[in-house]
Amino acid sequence: MKFIGKLLVYLLVALLIVILALYILLQTRWGATQVSSWVTVNTDYELSFDKMNHRFSSPSHIILENVTFGRDGKPASLVAKKVDIGLSSRQITDPLHMDTITLFDGTLNLSPQTAPLPFQADRLQLNNMAFNSPNTEWDLSAQKVTGGVSPWQPEAGNVLGNHAQIQMSAGSLTLNGVPATNVLIEGQLNGKEVVLNTIGADMARGSLTGSALRNADGSWIIDTMRLNEIRLQSDKTLTAFFAPLTTIPSLQIGRLDVTDARLQGPDWAVTDLDLSLRNLTLSKGDWQSQEGRLSMNASEFIYGSLHLFDPILNAEFSPQGMALRQFTSRWEGGMVRTSGNWLRDGKALVLDDVAIAGLEYTLPQNWKTLWMAPLPEWLNSVTLQKF
């Protein structure tokens, strides 16, 4: 019996020595190479890292250094200087579901070709990371990203998952060709619905703040949005500039405020624009509104040969049409003032009062052609009540 007892003790000591040796070896470059090779050979993924660290002061955390991870034959999904993996008792029943995963100083590629990833976490934390998501609905590139996704449950075609809370900031970001800096985003992913509770960014030498919702069908609801001191030059015509609004099912605007904006494109420009828009929905080339309002003024507005100085416009929207409360502007050395209504039923513009003073205007050479040109689709007739 004593012999069996001593044998068991020796075996236990030997086992502990082997475990300790493995523990030490795994934290060497040789151990990192062996683990990387095993994952690459025996799974559909490629993994490489230089070193694994573990400290008894943080027994539930494993740190990998200089990590590259991705699917076989595909671009790497993850490149990071350091990956901190937080473990919990959940690994007993679900080994690939971590408590936390923290990525430091690297790049996370969100392309559908790199998904799905085989692991999940209660929280994915990013520190000074870069995002890339080419060839997706949201063509995104971001640098110096810090923030978190909770929970993180990546799926095929959606590396962030379908249900998560998001809090992120980025030093710079380009979304569908639009650049911004000092970006802050807080929101949720609910299936194909995206809730943006807080949006903040510096863009076009100005700033943007607001909150919005993207529905599953691709339509947008803007609760609030404010643009301050935007300075934007575009190579697009005015029609092409607003063309993206026609590509989505609908855009519902609760409140939009623009302050001191300067916009310019080929053959059009507006300077010192102040705009306030309430309760308007754009859909399929038309609009709907219930108690909507528009107030707008600028120092200068140019569209083709039309050149207005100090234009002021105030209007109200309803299901019946638009009530033009005020339009005044300096034009061609004179002053123009009018008010009236545009009626949806019949597409008729009825101007209650039109006043023109001090006008010095020379008709263009093609004025007859312009006079005979058909009216736009939204206008069938014009009536002047008083001139």
Labelled PLM ranges:
Residues 1-17:
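N-terminal Sec-pathway targeting helices
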Residues 6-10, 22-24, 57-58, 155-158, ...:
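Short hydrophobic/aromatic-rich motifs at helix boundaries and adjacent loops
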Residues 19-112, 175-180:
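Terminal hydrophobic membrane-targeting helix
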Residues 42, 46-51, 143-155, 180-186, ...:
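Short small/polar-residue motifs
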Residues 45, 74-76, 136, 204-206, ...:
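Short acidic/polar mixed-charge low-complexity motifs
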Residues 56, 87-91, 153, 212-216, ...:
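Short, low-complexity Ser/Thr-rich regulatory SLiMs
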Residues 61, 66-68, 123-130, 160-189, ...:
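Small-residue helix/turn framework positions
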Residues 66-159, 215-251, 263-279, 363-376:
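Secondary-structure transition motifs
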